[in-house]
Amino acid sequence: MGEEGGSASHDEEERASVLLGHSPGCEMCSQEAFQAQRSQLVELLVSGSLEGFESVLDWLLSWEVLSWEDYEGFHLLGQPLSHLARRLLDTVWNKGTWACQKLIAAAQEAQADSQSPKLHGCWDPHSLHPARDLQSHRPAIVRRLHSHVENMLDLAWERGFVSQYECDEIRLPIFTPSQRARRLLDLATVKANGLAAFLLQHVQELPVPLALPLEAATCKKYMAKLRTTVSAQSRFLSTYDGAETLCLEDIYTENVLEVWADVGMAGPPQKSPATLGLEELFSTPGHLNDDADTVLVVGEAGSGKSTLLQRLHLLWAAGQDFQEFLFVFPFSCRQLQCMAKPLSVRTLLFEHCCWPDVGQEDIFQLLLDHPDRVLLTFDGFDEFKFRFTDRERHCSPTDPTSVQTLLFNLLQGNLLKNARKVVTSRPAAVSAFLRKYIRTEFNLKGFSEQGIELYLRKRHHEPGVADRLIRLLQETSALHGLCHLPVFSWMVSKCHQELLLQEGGSPKTTTDMYLLILQHFLLHATPPDSASQGLGPSLLRGRLPTLLHLGRLALWGLGMCCYVFSAQQLQAAQVSPDDISLGFLVRAKGVVPGSTAPLEFLHITFQCFFAAFYLALSADVPPALLRHLFNCGRPGNSPMARLLPTMCIQASEGKDSSVAALLQKAEPHNLQITAAFLAGLLSREHWGLLAECQTSEKALLRRQACARWCLARSLRKHFHSIPPAAPGEAKSVHAMPGFIWLIRSLYEMQEERLARKAARGLNVGHLKLTFCSVGPTECAALAFVLQHLRRPVALQLDYNSVGDIGVEQLLPCLGVCKALYLRDNNISDRGICKLIECALHCEQLQKLALFNNKLTDGCAHSMAKLLACRQNFLALRLGNNYITAAGAQVLAEGLRGNTSLQFLGFWGNRVGDEGAQALAEALGDHQSLRWLSLVGNNIGSVGAQALALMLAKNVMLEELCLEENHLQDEGVCSLAEGLKKNSSLKILKLSNNCITYLGAEALLQALERNDTILEVWLRGNTFSLEEVDKLGCRDTRLLL
């Protein structure tokens, strides 16, 4: 196979080589070894395409490992491949060791065939038992027949061996050529009319395939052209304003990419998602749907999704990574939706990506035959105006259909099944229907603190400039929080001179930042002798017509879900060449076929900003119309629609009705961004700027009053919708993402009075905001409102993107928090130390949950200080971090001086025996701790002895969790001695600790003298079934 042809991915080859044995014969594969490798075998059988699985079946059938009845059971349409693989393993295992060995051999043969097809033996074309010979030579016959099924069917039909109906069934477009060949052989097996003898003779006469068509010159030529095309499209990164062209290799900065974890799944606690490299996009375990082909990357607007895909394309085109794919086809969803004509898979790939100069039929057939070597990427699914549905099936790769039907069936796998697809989108655009067809989901969370610094250093090579910018960000937490999104880091880089020279303070809100970039563009478009030093009224007023033209175009585009504008659309919006020269409209990254030089806004957020600008200043927009903006969805479709009064969703009459219609048709996530910008523009901070541009100050006052009323009303309706608390319990509510955007809008307006009014309406004891894409900017907005609460609240922000910068933004509201939950938020020692420094003075705060972050021993001194100083502190949960014995020893010193702590969680750290000893010594006479977890901390018998001494002295501890350690019998015997003297412990968890019957016997003796303990967990230890029954009968408190 040529260089372009490549081979299976290195990971797959390595996994297969381990599973398939060290010798060709696999004679050492016993049933026990086979069963022990079951999960790996399932993964191997489903890791490729259905073609690979059916090849394994071919070999097993030819060797008579499978009977015909067995084989037919694996051809139920619609069954997931993983389900079929497990059934195959069950069937083979039940047939004994010989069958297990043959399955391993079949997998070897199928893998070898997929990489370098071998010529298999011949057969007697005049055999007296043709059906039996078709079966025994099945792999070779499928290989010989697969390119000639059409001709063979025609010939068999002419001679009366098959009916037209049977031909049509075999020719269904959902089948690959190899699958059609197999179905023809299957038909010959069950028909007794001479079809088997006919095939045996005529297949022998077919030409022998020398190699896969990947070797053909036309295929090699096309693959080379495709690589060149993709390389040209991805090698250079055009900045948002199109003013610079940078080498992607020089400027690309890794984002925080994490795999989405289903926290609802049963099983042991999961570690915090590791920050993944782009190269791990297709090799990450933990699939949502093993039978799906689509990888989803979600991220907020400006988080770097498009650049991530561009990097992927470049790595593939340069031969540096993703070489398991021979063909990569990149597409933009905002470009796809402009295609009005019906199109097929063939049209999409060839006419809208890369055209084969010769051999189109052969190349397309190659793509259909080897879909597992194909990758399609679809950028910006949130900008695709059609909502995903799986109602309309389309399975023909050659028949044309609408662009939305084509895309949706590609994502479902009805077209090009087993080809990988990567889709990027903002989270709000991903429906539950689409998630059914997602193999793996990733979160792109923007830059880390190190990423922001690295990006700025790559952008600025001038002496001292990058250092001054980084220092400015570190001193300005609000601006630093914005920069975790790459689009804001670009703005900071673009406006570095204005930021470093300004004296009025750094930007605080998103609106401030966009006005700064507006100032930058306006100043650069103004003659030097007339340019002012800032965004003054005269500068803005001078280009107001241009800004309103751009705003009208932006608003029309949002309402029509249009993000690429043709010359005719620009003309209709009165956008002139002079308006375009300002720089906010740039050439679209892809060209719509048949159009000339389409333009798009720098970024979707700029389109929302200009739409908000138009709504704030256009004389054609009556103030009352702004109420539509906060409807954020079509009536009845969105939770936001139910938050507002009916009057807010009624269309206005007359000249503003078209604007009302646009606002009602726009996508909710775009309306939310626009609403936040509008609130910022109408803030007191920017009142003077807008007043000078508005002919009627009264109209501007009415707009401002309307926005305030609408925000207050929306929040009040939201709070009133919260159901009352159960008697005796605190009111708890999980806020919806729409609530986050209302708070964001309030923060952009910077109205303390409104924030206090909103806080008065929030009468809850527990506010949950898990999985709400809360980043540093959202933290600043939450703190802006929550700091005015009259009653303490438990704030739960698990599974977000708070980070160290976000923690700093939350500090203003820490005084009203009685509990703070920050699970899975990529927080390090730096952020927690700042948090604790503030918490020392917050008497209300009694609980901290920090599991699944990046904490190390570096924060232990701060934790110890918190415990020693705050004698009303109740719970500290530090599970699944990176704390070792050194950190545990420091924390133990804080415990010695603490008299209030009731819950201490250390599971999933690395404290070991020394750490366990230090904690045990500190807790021996502790008067308040009721629950202690040291699960999964590499604790052995030495640590168990120290914990036993603690149990003998402690009179308060009620639950001790020690699962997933290495206590063994020696450690359990020590604990048993401690239990004999303990009078408070109710639950002892010892699962998965290599305990035998000897250790259990010691526990039973202790239980005879201890009436307090209610449960001892011993699951996952080394007991036989007989021992389990025996132990369970002796004491029901043993949970086995």
From Swiss-Prot:
Changing residue 408 to L: Abolished NF-kappa-B activation in response to muramyl dipeptide stimulation. GO terms for cellular component: basolateral plasma membrane; cell surface; cytoplasm; cytoskeleton; cytosol; extrinsic component of plasma membrane; Golgi apparatus; mitochondrion. A motif (ATG16L1-binding motif) lies at residues 63-77. Palmitoylated by ZDHHC5; palmitoylation is required for proper recruitment to the bacterial entry site and hence for proper signaling upon cognate peptidoglycan detection. Palmitoylation promotes localization to the cell membrane. Palmitoylation protects from SQSTM1/p62-dependent autophagic degradation. Polyubiquitinated by TRIM27, leading to proteasome-mediated degradation. Polyubiquitinated and degraded following muramyl dipeptide (MDP) stimulation, conferring MDP tolerance and preventing septic shock. Changing residue 978 to E: Abolished pattern recognition receptor activity. Residues 26-122, 126-218 form the CARD domain. Changing residue 396 to Y: Abolished NF-kappa-B activation in response to muramyl dipeptide stimulation. The keyword Nucleotide-binding applies. Changing residue 232 to P: Abolished NF-kappa-B activation in response to muramyl dipeptide stimulation. Changing residue 755 to V: In IBD1; uncertain significance. Changing residue 986 to I: Abolished pattern recognition receptor activity. Keywords: Adaptive immunity, ATP-binding, Autophagy, Cell membrane, Cytoplasm, Disease variant, Glycoprotein, Immunity, Innate immunity, Leucine-rich repeat, Lipoprotein, Membrane, Mitochondrion, Nucleotide-binding, Palmitate, Repeat, Ubl conjugation. Changing residue 248 to R: In IBD1; uncertain significance; no disruption of NOD2-CARD9 interaction. Changing residue 113 to N: In IBD1; uncertain significance. InterPro entries: CARD, DEATH-like_dom_sf, Leu-rich_rpt, LRR_dom_sf, NACHT_NTPase, NLR, NLRP_HD2, NOD1/2_WH. Changing residue 333 to Y: Abolished NF-kappa-B activation in response to muramyl dipeptide stimulation. Belongs to the NOD1-NOD2 family. This is Nucleotide-binding oligomerization domain-containing protein 2. The gene is NOD2.
